[in-house]
A protein has these predicted regions:
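Bacterial N-terminal signal peptides
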Residues: 12-23
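Structural recognition of the beta-strand scaffold that forms the well-ordered cores
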Residues: 38-44, 73-79, 115-120, 150-155, ...
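Aromatic-lined carbohydrate-binding/catalytic grooves of carbohydrate-active enzymes
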Residues: 60, 64-178
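Aromatic-lined carbohydrate-recognition surfaces of secreted/lumenal glycan-active proteins
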Residues: 110, 114-131, 187, 195-216
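Glycan-recognition surfaces
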Residues: 139, 199-298
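Catalytic cores of secreted or luminal carbohydrate-active enzymes
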Residues: 281-329
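Carbohydrate-binding surface patches
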Residues: 286-289, 294-296, 330-370
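C-terminal beta-strand-rich structural cap/linker in extracellular carbohydrate-active enzymes
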Residues: 387-408
């Protein structure tokens, strides 16, 4: 906000004074302060779906602490769709009977040193057919702030029919360019409206756009106040869905940075539809992508393998690196690289072949931007590999990955 003010001395002094007395102004520009690194936590949708209730969320918070996930960096406990009840005569939203006291639940989550997230839609109905925020944006933002909400996922859902623009992604259909532009502008305004509503509560709230990437959201979401935005349709708990989504992020790296992140959807690790190697691929790829790490499994029932994948601190450190640079593909055989602070680089070498013999894949160090030998550490084997001269050849398991940290 202060950056917008003229740089004259009096303006600078006024800004400094304003920030001392109203520190929330510092976060109010959706600056990097709200999510300086990609948000980490848990979301109810992938495992619990429409059945999620108060007890499930409390159990998730308990497990986040007991398992060590909180200490590994997972902080947000996010309720997805289906918590919404009816509005009262004044238009205030209430939770449904699955969530008897939302404020008490938020207090419980906070008492564990965690943060509390919630879900709504700019449309009249959410994707699950529950009450959305359409026409009640400020009122809902005020309610969330009163409950102690720290994170809002805002899901387009029924707002698509308000936009009357189903064909935004299908230009071949007979829709005029003007109509497309109008629909896009309406969507942007709807997202910005909630952004302004959240700001005026003066509570820092991470703002997550969920509209499946429509209209190249990564190009305009930061301007509309988004801290993260879904880039694709919903993920499923299988290798095909996860790898299609993950590897299709190539090219979006220039849109991410501290405070504004591409979101290829939540983690499926621990949900049972993939092998441990394939889940290691999701964890590694999401870390290379500087993607939000929102676990989507039942945290109260994790086996040792699931814990070891979700809580690999060396991989988490790649995701959470303070430079906030999203990695990119550096070689056709799915070799990806993410620059890290201090000049180090994370490199992930993926084997995407599931139904044939695994083949050796060679990383050329110069493709990762190194000239001369490098130190190498294997982040899944947790072991130093010594010095690499000019290349490194490995055979990652089918659907699996070898992930390295390289430095000179
Ligand atoms: C959409 C979103 C999902 C989930 C559901 C809930 O499909 O993309 O992540 O929030 O809605 O209804």
């Amino acid at each position: 906000m202060c950056a917008l003010v003229s740089l004259r001395r009096t303006a600078i002094v006024l800004c400094a004074v304003a920030l001392i007395f109203f520190p929330w102004l510092a976060v109010s520009a959706q600056s990097a302060n709200v999510s300086p690194t990609p948000p980490m936590g848990w979301n109810s949708w992938n495992h619990f779906g429409e059945k999620v209730n108060d007890a499930d969320v409390r159990a998730a918070a308990d497990a986040m602490v007991a398992s060590g996930m909180r200490d590994a960096g997972y902080i947000y406990v996010n309720i997805d769709d289906t918590w919404e009840g009816k509005r009262d005569a004044q238009g205030n939203i209430h939770a449904n009977s699955k969530f008897p006291d939302m404020k008490a639940l938020a207090d419980y989550v906070h008492s564990k040193g965690l943060k509390f997230g919630i879900y709504s839609s700019p449309g009249p109905k959410t994707c699950g057919g529950y009450e959305g925020s359409y026409g009640h944006e400020q009122q809902d933002a005020n309610t969330y702030a009163k409950w102690g909400v720290d994170y809002l996922k805002y899901d387009l859902c029924s707002y698509e029919s308000i936009m009357d623009m189903w064909d935004l992604n299908h230009p071949s259909k007979p829709v005029t360019v003007m109509r497309q532009q109008k629909a896009l502008a309406m969507m942007q305004q709807a997202y910005e409206k909630m952004h302004r509503s959240l700001l005026s509560t003066h509570r820092p709230i991470v703002y997550s756009f969920c509209q499946y990437g429509i209209g190249s959201v990564w190009k305009w979401a930061p301007e509309m106040g988004g801290n993260l935005w879904r880039t694709t349709d919903d993920i499923r708990d299988n290798y095909r869905s996860m790898s299609l989504i993950g590897f299709s992020q190539a090219g979006l790296e220039k849109y991410a940075g501290p405070g504004h992140w591409n979101d290829p959807d939540m983690l499926e690790i621990g949900n049972g539809g993939m092998t441990p190697d394939q889940y290691r691929t999701q964890m590694s790829l999401w870390a290379i992508l500087a993607a939000p790490l929102l676990a989507g499994n039942d945290l109260s029932k994790m086996d040792a393998t699931t814990k070891s994948i979700l809580m690999n601190k060396e991989v988490i450190a790649v995701d959470q690196d303070k430079l906030g640079i999203q990695g990119k593909r550096i070689a056709p055989l799915q070799i990806w690289m993410k620059p890290l602070s201090g000049g180090a680089k994370a490199v992930a070498i993926f084997n995407t072949i599931l139904d044939d013999q695994a083949i050796p894949i060679t990383l050329q160090l110069e493709d990762a931007g190194f000239t001369g030998p490098v130190h190498a550490r294997d982040l899944w084997a947790h072991k130093d590999l010594g010095i690499l001269q000019s290349s490194y050849t490995v055979v990652p398991p089918p659907g699996g990955v070898v992930m390295l940290r390289l430095w000179q």
